[in-house]
Amino acid sequence: MKVIIVNGSNNSGKDQFANFFNKHYEHKSVNWSTIDKVKKILKRNFGWNGKKNNESRLFMSEMKRIWSEFNNGPFEDMVTKISKYNANLPKSERQNIVYFIHCREPHEIQKFVDKYGKKCLTVLLKREDREVANNDSDKNVANYEYDFYIDNNGDKKELEKQVLEFIEKIKAS
């Protein structure tokens, strides 16, 4: 099992990176975010239409911050989700599954690194043409020392090539 924290500014290619990984990795991988539950709450209880803009990003960031300060909820929720998912896998799949976890905040990333140790890797996708959003989650994306840095300034074929190289690196680790 590996937990890969994938990060980057908005629209930096995090989902595309995980999708290419899933396409080429011979074992199972899943792609989740620590903000998923907050998004569901916003849609169900606050009328959010699912479209991301500066206002909705700020709202999500603040809700996640409050939940984290209240009871470490985003982290604990994801740890529980990983544990339950892993328990339901056949034993033969548990060793090689990869959990992509989107997490923006450096202090939250560190919680995963502390919990999963050598099973946890961190990746930052960087794009030169991306504007940083107006919230603390997005503003602090670069304030962490990641294990891997992916420059996503080319086309999708270039990103896919980098994903293939990344897969080889993690197989060797």
Question: Where on the chain are the PLM-derived regions?
Answer:
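Small-molecule kinase domains that catalyze NTP-dependent phosphoryl transfer to phosphate-bearing small molecules
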Residues: D114, L121-S173
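ATP-dependent NMP and nucleoside kinases share a basic, alpha-helical "lid"
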Residues: T80-N140
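Conserved lysine of the Walker
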Residues: K14
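Hydrophobic positions on the alpha1 helix immediately C-terminal to the Walker A/P-loop
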Residues: F17
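Extreme N-terminal starter segment of soluble prokaryotic enzymes
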Residues: M1-I4
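Post-Walker A helix-loop "phosphate-sensing" segment adjacent to the P-loop in P-loop NTPases
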Residues: K23-N31
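ATP-dependent small-molecule kinase phosphotransfer cores
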Residues: S33-V98, R104
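P-loop (Walker A) phosphate-binding loop of NTP-binding proteins
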Residues: S9
